[in-house]
Amino acid sequence: MIMMTRFAPSPTGYLHVGNVRTALICWLYTRSKQGRFLLRFDDTDLQRSKDDYRNEIANDLKWLQMDWDFDVRQSSRFDRYDEIFNYLLKEELIYPCYESKEELDFKRKMQLKLGLPPIYDRSALKLTQDEKNKYSERDVYFRFKIDQSQLISWDDEIRGKVSFNAANISDPIVKRADGTYTYMLPSVIDDIDFDITHIVRGEDHISNTAIQIQMFNALKASVPTFSHLSLLYCDDNKISKRVGGFSIKDMQFYELEPMAINSYFAKIGTSDPIVVHTKIQDLIYTFDITKFNQAPTQFNIDDVIKLNPKVLHKMSFSDVKLRLSELNITSPDLWDFVSGNVQKFSDIKEWIRICGQTTVPVINESDQDFIKMALSVFPNGEINQDTWKTWVANIKEKTDRKSKDIFIPLRLALTGISTGPELAKLLPILGRAEIIRRLGYSR
């Protein structure tokens, strides 16, 4: 059987890092098993769901190098949900209820006051037809009837054996009074219809899983394998759209590389060290869903920021060729020169400026004679990365300066700054004429 997973965001906001982690782990899991990946938009909330959010979610996943085999919108499947809803209603596994929100709140408070679990008391099931007729003017909503005699259990790939006493679970609302569906039933119907075999999601869905297992059973369908990830926390707050967790837009504002983000989320929550990679496919080979632990996982944006230069340092020219072409850079020499010295990709713009012909050299008065001498012994012939070694040897024959007192004045004269990448790689980029101009510069 082909493994099939799904990532099911609600297009009611931008992706936050908790979503991204779930999507990545789900994607890595199925790709590591040569499976298929469904992108499902849970947009049954027609008022809050927006096309702009849906497009941004898809674009963010592409930016993170995740692809999908097909996608679906729940809003296109209401007829199918109605079909299954009516079947379960006929089978008396779904039943109508008539309480107002205020009445339900009052019942819940009374149960808590009496020390009882705050679950629905099923009073709607005890109504006579006459009583139902009395409520005919009320808005009706519907619940799925839990089999409360069951012990609901499953083998979770992260949490091991998980069990719920169904007697302590409230019958979930599956259809609201306004006729819209809640998350529960459409999700199960989609998982059945699209042959979902494995579901990866946050531990905040564990109680939903217990309920949905009964829905799978009620529809005589195979129950998928579940993996419940520990939640991400930032400053002791659970990350969510409502808390205001970092979105991909925030990460892009920080100019973080996609693979800094992916390398981080592929390993936090496991005991494995975080190793940076430049391609998402490289993360597939070491992926193991069982390595994720149950402890709360702390997210720290500073840790991702620290990974960013490491990713850039490992990127080859081919990895950034398209982005460099947008800056009119077509030769690999400049990237080879600066890649080990940038914190974010945009830093290269400063090095383009430095390597251009408008840079003003810095030659201290105390170094002027030294720079003149250095220019006089600059090697003839083709300039390559060996030129620097020869040049330094020539200089050392003419001066008793220590290496530091040689390198810093030369760097200032050639770049205008006191730190930076290897000068050996800079010389071929500048060329003889520009080197002579800079070393011979006078105010």
Curated annotation (Swiss-Prot):
<dbReference type="InterPro" id="IPR020751">
    <property type="entry name" value="aa-tRNA-synth_I_codon-bd_sub2"/>
</dbReference>
<dbReference type="InterPro" id="IPR020058">
    <property type="entry name" value="Glu/Gln-tRNA-synth_Ib_cat-dom"/>
</dbReference>
<comment type="subunit">
    <text>Monomer.</text>
</comment>
<feature type="binding site">
    <location>
        <position position="241"/>
    </location>
    <ligand>
        <name>ATP</name>
    </ligand>
</feature>
<dbReference type="InterPro" id="IPR014729">
    <property type="entry name" value="Rossmann-like_a/b/a_fold"/>
</dbReference>
<feature type="short sequence motif" description="'HIGH' region">
    <location>
        <begin position="9"/>
        <end position="19"/>
    </location>
</feature>
<dbReference type="GO" id="GO:0006424">
    <property type="term" value="P:glutamyl-tRNA aminoacylation"/>
</dbReference>
<dbReference type="InterPro" id="IPR008925">
    <property type="entry name" value="aa_tRNA-synth_I_cd-bd_sf"/>
</dbReference>
<keyword id="KW-0963">Cytoplasm</keyword>
<keyword id="KW-0547">Nucleotide-binding</keyword>
<protein>
    <recommendedName>
        <fullName>Glutamate--tRNA ligase 1</fullName>
        <ecNumber>6.1.1.17</ecNumber>
    </recommendedName>
</protein>
<dbReference type="InterPro" id="IPR045462">
    <property type="entry name" value="aa-tRNA-synth_I_cd-bd"/>
</dbReference>
<dbReference type="InterPro" id="IPR001412">
    <property type="entry name" value="aa-tRNA-synth_I_CS"/>
</dbReference>
<dbReference type="InterPro" id="IPR000924">
    <property type="entry name" value="Glu/Gln-tRNA-synth"/>
</dbReference>
<keyword id="KW-0648">Protein biosynthesis</keyword>
<dbReference type="GO" id="GO:0005524">
    <property type="term" value="F:ATP binding"/>
</dbReference>
<dbReference type="Pfam" id="PF19269">
    <property type="entry name" value="Anticodon_2"/>
</dbReference>
<dbReference type="GO" id="GO:0004818">
    <property type="term" value="F:glutamate-tRNA ligase activity"/>
</dbReference>
<dbReference type="GO" id="GO:0005737">
    <property type="term" value="C:cytoplasm"/>
</dbReference>
<keyword id="KW-0067">ATP-binding</keyword>
<comment type="function">
    <text>Catalyzes the attachment of glutamate to tRNA(Glu) in a two-step reaction: glutamate is first activated by ATP to form Glu-AMP and then transferred to the acceptor end of tRNA(Glu).</text>
</comment>
<dbReference type="Pfam" id="PF00749">
    <property type="entry name" value="tRNA-synt_1c"/>
</dbReference>
<keyword id="KW-0436">Ligase</keyword>
<dbReference type="InterPro" id="IPR049940">
    <property type="entry name" value="GluQ/Sye"/>
</dbReference>
<keyword id="KW-0030">Aminoacyl-tRNA synthetase</keyword>
<dbReference type="InterPro" id="IPR004527">
    <property type="entry name" value="Glu-tRNA-ligase_bac/mito"/>
</dbReference>
<feature type="short sequence motif" description="'KMSKS' region">
    <location>
        <begin position="238"/>
        <end position="242"/>
    </location>
</feature>
<dbReference type="GO" id="GO:0000049">
    <property type="term" value="F:tRNA binding"/>
</dbReference>
<comment type="similarity">
    <text>Belongs to the class-I aminoacyl-tRNA synthetase family. Glutamate--tRNA ligase type 1 subfamily.</text>
</comment>
